[in-house]
């Protein structure tokens, strides 16, 4: 039971573009820092550039998607709003993915800033975990206690 209440920052595994199986909705932006495939990102209001999202920072949220093609600061990067990303940390299918308090990472539990960024998809037959994530950047859950 204790595990249900713990927040886990899921390390993003740097990978090649083949980790993206499908990219349904995507757009490009200018990186404000070095960004890698799988980083959860936001667009900063101060300069309009793309940065790693962070649930603890009011200037680094809300998340708008996940990096599909990364790059160094000042380069053009691809942000995926909806798609299927494989090769990530193994979690139970159906687990909701939230913006983490660790910059650019996923969390598998709410972090105080409750924005769902995706779900863990079913893996191969007869496996209890999956490394395949369905990414769908949703607006943050209102602080009034409303839920999706």
Where are these regions (language model features)?
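Glycine-anchored, exposed beta-strand/edge motif detector
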Residues: 11-148
